[in-house]
């Protein structure tokens, strides 16, 4: 673990990060038992929870599609509501008008990805940061996206605007090394996203995405810098997509021995082992936390499965438009 755990506040924060990752994984594991087309983020929880747990309630968060449910949980969403949304039940965030794992919670300062189009959330984040700059609030904004989306032109338009106008935004690449079946080693010219971002004159750094404490520290420092009016930061959080692009993806296009090596770097197991070795948790504590997360997910899934399906009333004007 890159950051020593040596005080009560840090211990509490790191336990919170561990619980956040465990809850996210438990919900995703439950979902994959009923959905063959879910886009799992197993092994990427360090980037997701490290980023979204660094946000204050006033900050703005925009998640990548992979892990959007984990990000929503990190921001206080009800797991039953998120699962209901994936199942298309009336108790979901869209009341059944849309089903899928792209739908996050509806909440102030949090914007889920409500379609499969990748990249627009980067522009939304830049716009949110511009708004906070113009109104003088200077709240921080953080957006996550994959290395495939990092080749989108909108990212570079956004980096340029954020740098030119010194906007309070943190760009976090959830760099899992695959865009469906295309490895990033064959898709990123020059091999470095950090060099690309640094060319815009902003701080740009690479962190170990499987070290949730390192991610949380980097994002927290970048957000503090943003709130001080010192502008944007780019963070390339290197991780690995140990699951398929979707649940039923056999991953025949890649070397499974590499996947096995990355599985050994699991962010949950790394933090749990660190807390145990530091004497801040026992293995029984870790097991109890995991069991609690799995019980919560199981209950949420059972409840959501029993929830009603939508009827035609969900497209009535009062349910489709804000007052």
Annotate each predicted stretch with a short phrase:
Residues 165-185:
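A short, conserved beta-to-alpha structural element at the edge of catalytic cores
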Residues 1-36, 57, 277, 303:
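Cofactor-/ligand-binding subdomain signature composed of acidic, glycine-rich
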Residues 133-137, 189-221, 263-290:
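Conserved thiamine diphosphate
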Residues 65-71, 145-151, 173-179, 210-213, ...:
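Acidic, glycine-rich active-site loops and adjacent beta-strand->loop/helix elements
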Residues 177-182, 202-207, 252-260, 285-286:
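Short beta-alpha connecting loops at secondary-structure transitions
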Residues 29, 33-165, 183-189, 194, ...:
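Cofactor-binding active-site loop characterized by glycine-rich and histidine/acidic residues
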Residues 2-3, 225-323:
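Glycine/aspartate-rich loop-and-adjacent alpha/beta segment that forms the canonical ThDP
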């Amino acid at each position: 673990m890159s950051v020593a755990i040596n005080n009560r506040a840090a211990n509490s924060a790191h336990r919170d990060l561990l619980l956040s990752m465990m809850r996210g994984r438990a919900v995703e594991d439950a979902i994959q038992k009923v959905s063959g087309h879910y886009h799992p983020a197993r092994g990427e929880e360090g980037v997701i929870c490290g980023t979204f747990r660094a946000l204050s309630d006033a900050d703005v968060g925009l998640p990548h599609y992979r892990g959007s449910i984990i990000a929503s949980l990190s921001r206080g969403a009800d797991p039953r509501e998120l699962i209901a949304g994936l199942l298309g039940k009336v108790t979901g965030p869209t009341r059944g008008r849309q089903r899928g794992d792209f739908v996050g919670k509806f909440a102030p300062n949090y914007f889920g990805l409500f379609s499969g189009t990748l990249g627009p959330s980067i522009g939304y984040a830049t716009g949110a940061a511009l708004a906070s700059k113009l109104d003088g609030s200077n709240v921080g904004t953080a957006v996550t996206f994959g290395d495939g989306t990092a080749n989108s032109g909108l990212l570079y338009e956004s980096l340029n605007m954020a740098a030119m106008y010194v906007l309070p935004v943190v760009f976090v690449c959830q760099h899992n090394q695959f865009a469906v079946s295309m490895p990033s080693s064959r898709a990123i010219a020059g091999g470095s996203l950090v060099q690309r971002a640094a060319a815009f004159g902003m701080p740009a750094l690479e962190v170990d995405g499987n070290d949730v404490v390192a991610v949380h520290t980097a994002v927290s420092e970048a957000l503090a810098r943003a709130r001080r009016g010192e502008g944007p930061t780019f963070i390339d959080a290197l991780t690995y997509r140990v699951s398929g692009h979707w649940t039923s993806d056999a991953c025949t296009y890649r070397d499974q021995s590499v996947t096995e090596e990355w599985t050994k770097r699991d962010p949950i197991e790394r933090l749990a082992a660190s807390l145990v070795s530091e004497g801040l948790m026992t293995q029984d504590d870790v097991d109890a936390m995991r069991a609690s997360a799995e019980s919560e997910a199981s209950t949420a899934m059972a409840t959501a499965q029993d929830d009603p399906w939508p009827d035609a009333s969900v497209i009535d004007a009062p349910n489709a438009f804000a007052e």
